[in-house]
């Protein structure tokens, strides 16, 4: 089965089997957000367990 190229661009698989993703709300309307909020949004997040299987199929 082919992988979805859109999903490959957005998600990374870790060695432990988790999937990393970027946070939303980072660029649009950013000036009014606090520096602390923008700093935390820069860090990668992991995909929740409920969506892990669906996204794993795509990559």
Swiss-Prot record:
GO cellular component, one term: ribosome
Region (Disordered): 17-47
SUPFAM superfamilies: L35p-like (SSF143034)
GO terms for biological process, alphabetical: translation
Molecular-function annotations in GO: structural constituent of ribosome
Listed Basic residues bias regions: 17-43
UniProt-listed InterPro entries: Ribosomal_bL35, Ribosomal_bL35-like, Ribosomal_bL35_CS, Ribosomal_bL35_sf
Keyword terms of this UniProt record: Ribonucleoprotein, Ribosomal protein
Pfam families (alphabetical): Ribosomal_L35p
Family: Belongs to the bacterial ribosomal protein bL35 family.
NCBIfam families per record: rpmI_bact (TIGR00001)
Name assigned to this protein: Large ribosomal subunit protein bL35
Organism of origin: Mycoplasma genitalium (strain ATCC 33530 / DSM 19775 / NCTC 10195 / G37)
The gene coding this protein: rpmI
